[in-house]
Amino acid sequence: MKFAILFGGNSYEHEISIVSAVVLKKVINQNLEFIFCDEERRFYHIPSEKMNSKTFSTKAYKKEKELFIKQGGFFSKGFLKENKLECECVINLIHGRDGEDGKIAALFEFYSIKFIGPRLEASVLSFNKELTKLYAKSVGVKTLDYTMVRKGQNSKEKLSFPCIIKPARLGSSIGISIVKDEKDLEYAKDVGFEFDNDLVVEEFKNNIKEYNLAGCMINDEFVFSIIEEPKKKEFLDFEQKYLSFSGHNELIEANLSEELKEKLKDSFKKIYNPLFKGALIRCDFFILDNEIYLNEINPNPGSLANYLFKDFSTTLNALADQISLEKMIKISYNFLHSINGQKGKL
């Protein structure tokens, strides 16, 4: 299977998406194409040998072929004709806005482009933390209690401390603050409101454990990664979350009982099926007093969480093989023809 990796986007996580693509280039041992979406949402075909940080930080990518999207794929302008970029499946590796909020999913579905990544409905529900909590509750997965704080509205709910404040629509740890007492609350809210008009506030739990589990569905069977217990400080910050996914060090599976492992996998299944079919996702869970709570869904995890899988390439190819395009509706115009053949034409 020949893949094209789409990365970049107009997102706060633009640079991290570049790092993610460079890492994945080293992991996937097969022929790849690279499509860069810059901050103006223009697409460029990046040669494999130029997949490095300098190409993007110096804007040298603008010297490469610009691509445009239309029915069936990505194309570049040739001397006499348009040239289609040869690939069988696109990997959506744009983190945050554009890649995880549904824009790319809608674009690919509209233009009949086969891709690995969350579909439109899955993107919308996983990108907004408030909607994620409501969705998790609907499928029987617990989340921590929360309060919504909205810009321009005076919240009447009394907050307890310490608490953690998160922008509702941001696919990373950006804009998150731990507030230990009321005197720090307004500053933390101001930080969060720089990124979103809606904030999720949760009670901060000191004795909570976090575990990550990635997976996908292939031919109606779940394929799981190992379960990871990330090393962290008070919470998983931006650098920890994204600069540790290159897989240079061998991961050791979390030391959990078989009962808790099965509980985590069962919660993952409830979240994934059927909404996230076609995507390889990572769910971040909390365990508190032997109870499982969903923290967040990562629909496009850093470098597709390759470091958590024992045979990532095989999993990726098998996932791509079973993805099918939406069936096009045949328009016959019979109704309009019938009107046209009658008196009093439309």
Swiss-Prot record:
Mg(2+) 2 binds at residues 296, 298. Its main location: cytoplasm. It is found in: Cytoplasm. It comes from the Bacteria. It is an enzyme of class 6 (ligase). Its cofactor is Mg(2+); Mn(2+). GO terms for cellular component: cytoplasm. Keywords: ATP-binding, Cell shape, Cell wall biogenesis/degradation, Cytoplasm, Ligase, Magnesium, Manganese, Metal-binding, Nucleotide-binding, Peptidoglycan synthesis. Residues 133-327 form the ATP-grasp domain. NCBIfam families: D_ala_D_alaTIGR, PRK01966.1-3. Cell wall formation. Belongs to the D-alanine--D-alanine ligase family. This is D-alanine--D-alanine ligase. It comes from Campylobacter jejuni subsp. jejuni serotype O:23/36 (strain 81-176).
